Amino acid sequence: MAACVGSRTLSKDDVNYRLHFRMINEQQVEDITLEFFYRPHTITLLSFTILSLMAFAFTRDDSVPEENIWRGILSVIFFFLIISVLAFPNGPFTRPHPAIWRMVFGLSVLYFLFLVFVLFLNFEQVKAVMYWLDPNLRYATREADIMEYAVNCHVITWERILSHFDIFAFGHFWGWAMKALLIRSYGLCWTISITWELTELFFMHLLPNFAECWWDQVILDILLCNGGGIWLGMVVCRFLEMRTYHWASFKDIHTTTGKIKRAVLQFTPASWTYVRWFDPKSSFQRVAGIYLFMIIWQLTELNTFFLKHIFVFQASHPLSWGRILFIGIITAPTVRQYYAYLTDTQCKRVGTQCWVFGVIAFLEAIVCIKFGQDLFSKTQILYVVFWLLCVAFTTFLCLYGMVWYAEYYGHREKTLSESEDSPYSPDASWLHSKFSKGADNSPPKHPVNSESHSSRRRNRHSRSKVTNGIGKK
Protein backbone atom coordinates (compact mmCIF):
# COMPACT_ATOMS: atom_id res chain seq x y z
CA MET A 1 0.00 0.00 0.00
CA ALA A 2 1.37 3.39 -0.93
CA ALA A 3 1.46 6.41 1.35
CA CYS A 4 0.91 10.04 0.40
CA VAL A 5 2.98 13.14 1.07
CA GLY A 6 1.05 16.11 -0.26
CA SER A 7 0.15 15.22 -3.83
CA ARG A 8 3.00 12.72 -4.26
CA THR A 9 2.52 9.02 -3.61
CA LEU A 10 5.28 7.14 -1.81
CA SER A 11 5.95 3.52 -2.60
CA LYS A 12 6.45 0.90 0.09
CA ASP A 13 10.22 1.04 -0.52
CA ASP A 14 10.21 4.82 0.01
CA VAL A 15 8.33 4.41 3.26
CA ASN A 16 10.75 1.74 4.47
CA TYR A 17 13.72 3.89 3.43
CA ARG A 18 12.47 6.89 5.40
CA LEU A 19 11.67 4.72 8.39
CA HIS A 20 15.09 3.04 8.48
CA PHE A 21 16.92 6.35 8.09
CA ARG A 22 14.85 7.91 10.86
CA MET A 23 15.68 5.01 13.17
CA ILE A 24 19.41 5.88 13.03
CA ASN A 25 19.14 9.64 12.57
CA GLU A 26 16.06 10.67 14.57
CA GLN A 27 15.46 8.01 17.20
CA GLN A 28 12.27 8.34 19.19
CA VAL A 29 11.73 7.61 22.88
CA GLU A 30 9.22 4.89 23.68
CA ASP A 31 7.00 4.60 26.75
CA ILE A 32 7.56 8.12 28.09
CA THR A 33 6.41 8.32 31.70
CA LEU A 34 7.99 11.57 32.92
CA GLU A 35 6.33 13.84 30.41
CA PHE A 36 8.01 17.00 31.71
CA PHE A 37 11.48 15.89 30.58
CA TYR A 38 10.34 15.00 27.05
CA ARG A 39 7.69 17.62 26.34
CA PRO A 40 8.89 20.52 24.11
CA HIS A 41 9.62 23.71 26.04
CA THR A 42 10.18 26.07 23.13
CA ILE A 43 8.44 29.09 24.67
CA THR A 44 10.32 28.60 27.93
CA LEU A 45 13.64 28.41 26.08
CA LEU A 46 12.75 31.48 24.02
CA SER A 47 11.97 33.47 27.16
CA PHE A 48 15.15 32.26 28.85
CA THR A 49 17.23 33.17 25.79
CA ILE A 50 15.84 36.70 25.53
CA LEU A 51 16.19 37.41 29.26
CA SER A 52 19.73 36.02 29.32
CA LEU A 53 20.82 38.12 26.36
CA MET A 54 19.32 41.23 27.95
CA ALA A 55 21.17 40.53 31.18
CA PHE A 56 24.47 39.96 29.39
CA ALA A 57 24.02 43.06 27.24
CA PHE A 58 23.11 45.61 29.92
CA THR A 59 24.45 44.40 33.27
CA ARG A 60 27.95 43.02 32.75
CA ASP A 61 31.14 45.09 32.76
CA ASP A 62 32.51 45.41 29.21
CA SER A 63 35.61 47.45 29.98
CA VAL A 64 38.03 44.53 29.43
CA PRO A 65 38.30 43.73 25.69
CA GLU A 66 39.68 40.21 26.14
CA GLU A 67 36.92 39.32 28.58
CA ASN A 68 34.35 40.59 26.09
CA ILE A 69 35.69 38.31 23.37
CA TRP A 70 35.95 35.28 25.65
CA ARG A 71 32.47 35.63 27.13
CA GLY A 72 31.05 36.39 23.71
CA ILE A 73 32.48 33.14 22.32
CA LEU A 74 31.13 31.15 25.27
CA SER A 75 27.71 32.73 24.82
CA VAL A 76 27.67 31.88 21.11
CA ILE A 77 28.51 28.25 21.94
CA PHE A 78 25.88 28.13 24.69
CA PHE A 79 23.05 29.50 22.57
CA PHE A 80 24.10 27.39 19.60
CA LEU A 81 23.64 24.35 21.83
CA ILE A 82 20.16 25.59 22.74
CA ILE A 83 19.34 25.75 19.03
CA SER A 84 20.81 22.25 18.71
CA VAL A 85 18.37 20.95 21.31
CA LEU A 86 15.48 22.54 19.43
CA ALA A 87 16.38 21.73 15.84
CA PHE A 88 19.01 19.00 15.50
CA PRO A 89 18.26 15.25 15.23
CA ASN A 90 18.56 12.90 18.20
CA GLY A 91 20.81 10.45 16.42
CA PRO A 92 20.62 6.70 17.07
CA PHE A 93 20.62 6.92 20.89
CA THR A 94 18.06 8.12 23.43
CA ARG A 95 19.85 7.50 26.74
CA PRO A 96 20.28 9.27 29.05
CA HIS A 97 18.24 11.87 27.12
CA PRO A 98 17.92 12.79 23.42
CA ALA A 99 18.78 16.42 24.22
CA ILE A 100 22.29 15.36 25.27
CA TRP A 101 22.94 13.68 21.91
CA ARG A 102 21.55 16.72 20.10
CA MET A 103 24.09 18.87 21.94
CA VAL A 104 26.84 16.37 21.09
CA PHE A 105 25.90 16.75 17.44
CA GLY A 106 25.82 20.53 17.89
CA LEU A 107 29.35 20.49 19.34
CA SER A 108 30.57 18.42 16.40
CA VAL A 109 29.07 20.96 13.99
CA LEU A 110 30.78 23.78 15.91
CA TYR A 111 34.11 21.95 15.74
CA PHE A 112 33.63 21.40 12.02
CA LEU A 113 32.97 25.13 11.51
CA PHE A 114 36.01 25.98 13.65
CA LEU A 115 38.24 23.81 11.44
CA VAL A 116 36.86 25.56 8.36
CA PHE A 117 37.70 28.91 9.98
CA VAL A 118 41.25 27.74 10.83
CA LEU A 119 41.87 26.89 7.17
CA PHE A 120 41.64 30.61 6.34
CA LEU A 121 44.26 31.66 8.91
CA ASN A 122 48.02 31.61 8.69
CA PHE A 123 50.26 29.80 11.13
CA GLU A 124 51.05 32.92 13.19
CA GLN A 125 47.35 33.68 13.62
CA VAL A 126 46.61 30.13 14.76
CA LYS A 127 49.44 30.31 17.29
CA ALA A 128 48.13 33.69 18.48
CA VAL A 129 44.73 32.11 19.15
CA MET A 130 46.40 29.27 21.06
CA TYR A 131 48.47 31.72 23.14
CA TRP A 132 45.32 33.69 23.88
CA LEU A 133 43.62 30.52 25.14
CA ASP A 134 46.67 29.46 27.18
CA PRO A 135 49.67 31.82 27.48
CA ASN A 136 51.80 28.94 28.82
CA LEU A 137 51.80 27.39 25.34
CA ARG A 138 54.45 29.97 24.39
CA TYR A 139 56.93 27.87 26.36
CA ALA A 140 55.75 24.44 25.20
CA THR A 141 58.26 22.10 23.56
CA ARG A 142 57.81 19.09 21.37
CA GLU A 143 58.14 15.74 23.10
CA ALA A 144 60.31 14.53 20.21
CA ASP A 145 62.83 17.32 20.92
CA ILE A 146 63.44 16.37 24.54
CA MET A 147 62.96 12.59 24.58
CA GLU A 148 64.68 9.62 22.99
CA TYR A 149 62.78 6.74 21.47
CA ALA A 150 63.71 3.12 20.68
CA VAL A 151 67.09 3.36 22.42
CA ASN A 152 68.95 0.26 23.71
CA CYS A 153 66.13 -2.07 22.74
CA HIS A 154 68.32 -5.08 23.45
CA VAL A 155 68.37 -4.18 27.15
CA ILE A 156 65.25 -5.79 28.62
CA THR A 157 64.83 -5.62 32.40
CA TRP A 158 61.82 -5.75 34.71
CA GLU A 159 62.56 -2.21 35.89
CA ARG A 160 62.53 -0.91 32.34
CA ILE A 161 59.33 -2.78 31.47
CA LEU A 162 57.52 -1.57 34.59
CA SER A 163 58.61 2.01 33.87
CA HIS A 164 56.47 1.91 30.72
CA PHE A 165 53.29 1.29 32.72
CA ASP A 166 52.48 4.98 33.12
CA ILE A 167 49.35 7.08 32.60
CA PHE A 168 49.60 6.53 28.85
CA ALA A 169 49.49 2.74 29.28
CA PHE A 170 46.42 3.22 31.45
CA GLY A 171 44.94 5.38 28.69
CA HIS A 172 45.71 2.69 26.11
CA PHE A 173 43.90 0.07 28.17
CA TRP A 174 40.72 2.04 28.87
CA GLY A 175 40.76 3.57 25.42
CA TRP A 176 40.62 0.14 23.83
CA ALA A 177 37.95 -0.98 26.26
CA MET A 178 35.80 1.91 25.02
CA LYS A 179 36.66 1.14 21.38
CA ALA A 180 35.59 -2.47 21.90
CA LEU A 181 32.26 -1.25 23.29
CA LEU A 182 31.77 0.80 20.13
CA ILE A 183 32.96 -1.71 17.52
CA ARG A 184 31.81 -4.91 19.31
CA SER A 185 33.90 -7.23 17.16
CA TYR A 186 37.04 -9.09 18.21
CA GLY A 187 38.16 -9.35 14.59
CA LEU A 188 37.91 -5.64 13.78
CA CYS A 189 39.34 -4.55 17.13
CA TRP A 190 42.42 -6.74 16.80
CA THR A 191 42.84 -5.73 13.16
CA ILE A 192 42.71 -2.02 14.04
CA SER A 193 45.12 -2.56 16.94
CA ILE A 194 47.71 -4.38 14.82
CA THR A 195 47.22 -2.05 11.86
CA TRP A 196 47.87 0.96 14.08
CA GLU A 197 51.23 -0.44 15.15
CA LEU A 198 52.08 -0.90 11.47
CA THR A 199 50.91 2.66 10.82
CA GLU A 200 53.41 3.88 13.40
CA LEU A 201 56.19 2.09 11.53
CA PHE A 202 55.24 3.64 8.19
CA PHE A 203 55.02 7.18 9.62
CA MET A 204 58.03 6.89 11.92
CA HIS A 205 60.10 8.97 9.48
CA LEU A 206 57.77 11.93 10.16
CA LEU A 207 57.05 11.51 13.87
CA PRO A 208 60.05 10.26 15.90
CA ASN A 209 57.84 9.37 18.88
CA PHE A 210 56.37 6.53 16.78
CA ALA A 211 59.69 4.70 17.17
CA GLU A 212 59.36 1.96 19.79
CA CYS A 213 61.27 -1.12 20.84
CA TRP A 214 59.83 -4.36 19.52
CA TRP A 215 58.92 -5.62 22.98
CA ASP A 216 57.20 -2.33 23.80
CA GLN A 217 55.19 -2.44 20.58
CA VAL A 218 54.28 -6.12 20.52
CA ILE A 219 54.08 -7.17 24.17
CA LEU A 220 53.11 -4.02 26.06
CA ASP A 221 50.99 -2.28 23.43
CA ILE A 222 49.33 -4.99 21.33
CA LEU A 223 49.07 -7.87 23.79
CA LEU A 224 48.76 -6.31 27.24
CA CYS A 225 47.29 -2.80 26.97
CA ASN A 226 45.31 -3.09 23.74
CA GLY A 227 44.50 -6.77 24.16
CA GLY A 228 43.42 -6.36 27.77
CA GLY A 229 41.21 -3.41 26.88
CA ILE A 230 39.63 -5.30 23.98
CA TRP A 231 38.94 -8.30 26.22
CA LEU A 232 37.33 -6.14 28.93
CA GLY A 233 35.19 -4.24 26.43
CA MET A 234 33.98 -7.43 24.74
CA VAL A 235 33.16 -9.03 28.11
CA VAL A 236 30.95 -6.04 28.89
CA CYS A 237 29.38 -6.35 25.42
CA ARG A 238 28.57 -10.02 25.98
CA PHE A 239 27.07 -9.20 29.38
CA LEU A 240 24.85 -6.50 27.90
CA GLU A 241 23.78 -8.82 25.06
CA MET A 242 22.72 -11.52 27.53
CA ARG A 243 20.51 -9.25 29.61
CA THR A 244 16.75 -8.94 29.21
CA TYR A 245 15.73 -5.29 28.99
CA HIS A 246 12.40 -4.29 30.45
CA TRP A 247 12.16 -0.62 31.29
CA ALA A 248 9.03 0.59 33.07
CA SER A 249 7.75 3.79 34.61
CA PHE A 250 9.13 5.52 37.67
CA LYS A 251 5.54 5.55 38.89
CA ASP A 252 5.52 1.75 39.06
CA ILE A 253 8.48 1.74 41.46
CA HIS A 254 7.28 2.32 45.01
CA THR A 255 10.55 2.29 46.95
CA THR A 256 13.06 5.12 47.20
CA THR A 257 15.96 2.73 46.58
CA GLY A 258 14.26 1.40 43.47
CA LYS A 259 13.69 4.90 42.11
CA ILE A 260 17.35 5.80 42.72
CA LYS A 261 18.53 2.64 40.95
CA ARG A 262 16.20 3.35 38.04
CA ALA A 263 17.51 6.93 37.79
CA VAL A 264 21.13 5.72 37.74
CA LEU A 265 20.35 3.07 35.10
CA GLN A 266 18.92 5.82 32.90
CA PHE A 267 22.56 6.36 31.93
CA THR A 268 22.85 2.80 30.59
CA PRO A 269 21.69 1.55 27.17
CA ALA A 270 17.98 0.91 26.66
CA SER A 271 18.92 -2.16 24.60
CA TRP A 272 22.01 -3.72 23.05
CA THR A 273 22.60 -4.70 19.44
CA TYR A 274 24.39 -7.90 18.51
CA VAL A 275 26.85 -6.78 15.82
CA ARG A 276 27.88 -8.69 12.69
CA TRP A 277 30.13 -6.49 10.59
CA PHE A 278 30.63 -9.21 8.02
CA ASP A 279 29.05 -12.48 6.94
CA PRO A 280 29.64 -14.91 4.05
CA LYS A 281 26.92 -13.33 1.91
CA SER A 282 28.27 -9.79 2.18
CA SER A 283 28.81 -7.84 -1.02
CA PHE A 284 31.97 -6.16 -2.26
CA GLN A 285 30.41 -2.86 -1.16
CA ARG A 286 30.48 -4.10 2.44
CA VAL A 287 34.16 -5.00 2.09
CA ALA A 288 34.97 -1.58 0.64
CA GLY A 289 32.93 0.07 3.39
CA ILE A 290 34.88 -1.68 6.13
CA TYR A 291 38.15 -0.73 4.42
CA LEU A 292 37.02 2.92 4.41
CA PHE A 293 36.11 2.54 8.08
CA MET A 294 39.65 1.32 8.79
CA ILE A 295 41.24 4.20 6.86
CA ILE A 296 39.19 6.90 8.61
CA TRP A 297 39.88 5.30 12.00
CA GLN A 298 43.64 5.29 11.35
CA LEU A 299 43.46 8.85 9.99
CA THR A 300 41.71 10.07 13.14
CA GLU A 301 44.42 8.47 15.28
CA LEU A 302 47.17 10.01 13.15
CA ASN A 303 45.58 13.45 13.45
CA THR A 304 45.99 13.26 17.23
CA PHE A 305 49.78 13.02 16.93
CA PHE A 306 50.24 15.37 13.99
CA LEU A 307 48.18 18.15 15.61
CA LYS A 308 50.18 18.18 18.84
CA HIS A 309 53.47 17.91 16.91
CA ILE A 310 52.72 20.72 14.44
CA PHE A 311 51.07 23.15 16.87
CA VAL A 312 53.39 22.16 19.76
CA PHE A 313 51.48 21.14 22.85
CA GLN A 314 51.98 18.24 25.22
CA ALA A 315 49.83 15.12 25.31
CA SER A 316 48.76 16.09 28.85
CA HIS A 317 47.43 19.49 27.72
CA PRO A 318 43.63 19.98 27.64
CA LEU A 319 43.83 20.67 23.90
CA SER A 320 45.06 17.08 23.47
CA TRP A 321 43.02 15.02 25.91
CA GLY A 322 39.97 17.26 25.46
CA ARG A 323 39.97 16.57 21.73
CA ILE A 324 40.45 12.83 22.33
CA LEU A 325 37.51 12.78 24.75
CA PHE A 326 35.34 14.77 22.34
CA ILE A 327 36.20 12.52 19.38
CA GLY A 328 35.45 9.49 21.54
CA ILE A 329 31.98 10.80 22.38
CA ILE A 330 30.97 11.60 18.81
CA THR A 331 32.41 8.27 17.65
CA ALA A 332 29.63 6.37 19.46
CA PRO A 333 26.70 7.56 17.28
CA THR A 334 28.99 7.67 14.24
CA VAL A 335 29.88 3.97 14.43
CA ARG A 336 26.24 3.04 15.05
CA GLN A 337 25.06 4.99 12.00
CA TYR A 338 27.86 3.69 9.79
CA TYR A 339 27.17 0.10 10.85
CA ALA A 340 23.50 0.52 9.95
CA TYR A 341 24.48 1.99 6.58
CA LEU A 342 26.72 -1.00 5.82
CA THR A 343 24.50 -3.81 7.05
CA ASP A 344 20.93 -2.58 6.51
CA THR A 345 19.92 -2.83 2.84
CA GLN A 346 17.02 -0.44 3.50
CA CYS A 347 19.37 2.30 4.74
CA LYS A 348 20.57 4.14 1.63
CA ARG A 349 22.43 7.05 3.25
CA VAL A 350 24.69 7.69 6.22
CA GLY A 351 23.42 9.54 9.26
CA THR A 352 24.19 13.21 9.81
CA GLN A 353 26.56 12.56 12.73
CA CYS A 354 28.49 10.05 10.62
CA TRP A 355 28.73 12.58 7.79
CA VAL A 356 30.02 15.33 10.09
CA PHE A 357 32.55 12.97 11.69
CA GLY A 358 33.97 12.04 8.29
CA VAL A 359 34.31 15.71 7.34
CA ILE A 360 36.04 16.45 10.66
CA ALA A 361 38.58 13.65 10.14
CA PHE A 362 39.57 14.88 6.69
CA LEU A 363 39.50 18.57 7.71
CA GLU A 364 41.92 17.85 10.56
CA ALA A 365 44.21 16.11 8.08
CA ILE A 366 43.99 19.10 5.71
CA VAL A 367 44.81 21.49 8.56
CA CYS A 368 47.84 19.38 9.48
CA ILE A 369 49.09 19.31 5.89
CA LYS A 370 48.58 23.07 5.40
CA PHE A 371 50.41 24.14 8.57
CA GLY A 372 52.95 21.33 8.56
CA GLN A 373 54.32 21.66 5.04
CA ASP A 374 57.90 21.59 6.32
CA LEU A 375 57.16 18.29 8.04
CA PHE A 376 55.19 16.71 5.20
CA SER A 377 57.79 17.76 2.63
CA LYS A 378 59.87 14.91 4.10
CA THR A 379 57.15 12.36 3.39
CA GLN A 380 58.26 9.22 1.62
CA ILE A 381 55.44 8.62 -0.85
CA LEU A 382 56.40 4.98 -1.17
CA TYR A 383 55.80 4.51 2.56
CA VAL A 384 52.31 5.99 2.25
CA VAL A 385 51.49 3.69 -0.68
CA PHE A 386 52.76 0.69 1.26
CA TRP A 387 50.68 1.81 4.24
CA LEU A 388 47.49 1.93 2.16
CA LEU A 389 48.27 -1.50 0.72
CA CYS A 390 49.06 -2.83 4.18
CA VAL A 391 45.75 -1.57 5.57
CA ALA A 392 43.97 -3.17 2.60
CA PHE A 393 45.76 -6.48 3.15
CA THR A 394 45.09 -6.60 6.89
CA THR A 395 41.45 -5.61 6.29
CA PHE A 396 40.86 -8.39 3.78
CA LEU A 397 42.76 -10.83 5.99
CA CYS A 398 40.53 -9.89 8.90
CA LEU A 399 37.38 -10.24 6.83
CA TYR A 400 38.51 -13.60 5.49
CA GLY A 401 39.01 -14.78 9.06
CA MET A 402 35.58 -13.48 10.06
CA VAL A 403 34.00 -15.29 7.08
CA TRP A 404 35.79 -18.51 8.00
CA TYR A 405 34.62 -18.17 11.59
CA ALA A 406 31.05 -17.47 10.48
CA GLU A 407 31.03 -20.53 8.23
CA TYR A 408 32.37 -22.97 10.81
CA TYR A 409 31.18 -21.51 14.09
CA GLY A 410 28.42 -19.11 13.06
CA HIS A 411 25.66 -21.59 13.89
CA ARG A 412 26.65 -21.28 17.54
CA GLU A 413 26.31 -17.52 17.54
CA LYS A 414 23.21 -15.40 17.74
CA THR A 415 21.97 -14.16 14.41
CA LEU A 416 19.49 -11.63 15.70
CA SER A 417 20.53 -8.06 14.93
CA GLU A 418 18.07 -5.45 16.16
CA SER A 419 18.23 -1.69 15.87
CA GLU A 420 19.53 -0.25 19.12
CA ASP A 421 16.98 1.74 21.09
CA SER A 422 14.53 1.16 18.23
CA PRO A 423 10.97 2.00 19.22
CA TYR A 424 9.57 0.79 15.91
CA SER A 425 7.95 -2.42 14.88
CA PRO A 426 6.81 -3.17 11.32
CA ASP A 427 3.29 -1.87 11.89
CA ALA A 428 1.81 -1.39 8.44
CA SER A 429 -1.03 0.82 9.61
CA TRP A 430 1.33 3.28 11.25
CA LEU A 431 3.71 3.24 8.27
CA HIS A 432 0.78 4.29 6.12
CA SER A 433 -0.45 6.97 8.49
CA LYS A 434 3.07 8.32 9.13
CA PHE A 435 3.37 9.69 5.60
CA SER A 436 -0.31 10.48 5.04
CA LYS A 437 -1.38 14.09 4.80
CA GLY A 438 -2.61 15.41 8.12
CA ALA A 439 -1.93 12.14 9.93
CA ASP A 440 -0.71 11.84 13.49
CA ASN A 441 3.06 11.34 13.43
CA SER A 442 3.31 9.47 16.71
CA PRO A 443 4.20 5.78 16.68
CA PRO A 444 1.61 3.23 17.71
CA LYS A 445 1.13 2.72 21.39
CA HIS A 446 1.77 -0.75 22.77
CA PRO A 447 0.00 -2.26 25.76
CA VAL A 448 1.94 -2.30 28.98
CA ASN A 449 2.44 -6.05 28.86
CA SER A 450 3.28 -6.29 25.17
CA GLU A 451 6.68 -7.40 23.93
CA SER A 452 8.25 -4.27 22.41
CA HIS A 453 11.33 -4.62 20.20
CA SER A 454 13.28 -2.00 22.11
CA SER A 455 11.95 -2.36 25.64
CA ARG A 456 12.45 -6.15 25.71
CA ARG A 457 15.38 -8.15 24.46
CA ARG A 458 14.73 -11.88 24.92
CA ASN A 459 17.41 -14.52 24.78
CA ARG A 460 17.02 -18.13 25.78
CA HIS A 461 20.52 -18.15 27.26
CA SER A 462 19.80 -15.13 29.47
CA ARG A 463 20.58 -15.57 33.15
CA SER A 464 19.68 -12.16 34.51
CA LYS A 465 16.79 -9.80 34.18
CA VAL A 466 16.37 -6.07 34.61
CA THR A 467 12.91 -4.89 35.60
CA ASN A 468 12.31 -1.21 36.30
CA GLY A 469 16.05 -0.83 36.67
CA ILE A 470 16.29 -3.35 39.54
CA GLY A 471 18.19 -6.58 38.79
CA LYS A 472 16.61 -9.92 39.59
CA LYS A 473 18.26 -13.30 39.42
Swiss-Prot record:
Subcellular locations according to the entry: Endoplasmic reticulum membrane
Comp. bias regions, Basic residues: 455-464
Record GO terms (molecular function): L-serine-phosphatidylcholine phosphatidyltransferase activity; L-serine-phosphatidylethanolamine phosphatidyltransferase activity
E.C. number(s) listed in UniProt: 2.7.8.29
Topological region Lumenal: 57-72, 124-186, 238-286, 343-355, 402-473
Topology with respect to the bilayer: Multi-pass membrane protein
Catalytic activity, reaction form: a 1,2-diacyl-sn-glycero-3-phosphoethanolamine + L-serine = a 1,2-diacyl-sn-glycero-3-phospho-L-serine + ethanolamine; a 1,2-diacyl-sn-glycero-3-phosphocholine + L-serine = a 1,2-diacyl-sn-glycero-3-phospho-L-serine + choline
GO biological processes: phosphatidylserine biosynthetic process
Region ranges (Disordered): 420-473
Main location: endoplasmic reticulum
Role played: Catalyzes a base-exchange reaction in which the polar head group of phosphatidylethanolamine (PE) or phosphatidylcholine (PC) is replaced by L-serine. Catalyzes mainly the conversion of phosphatidylcholine but also converts, in vitro and to a lesser extent, phosphatidylethanolamine.
Protein name per UniProt: Phosphatidylserine synthase 1
Organism this protein belongs to: Gallus gallus
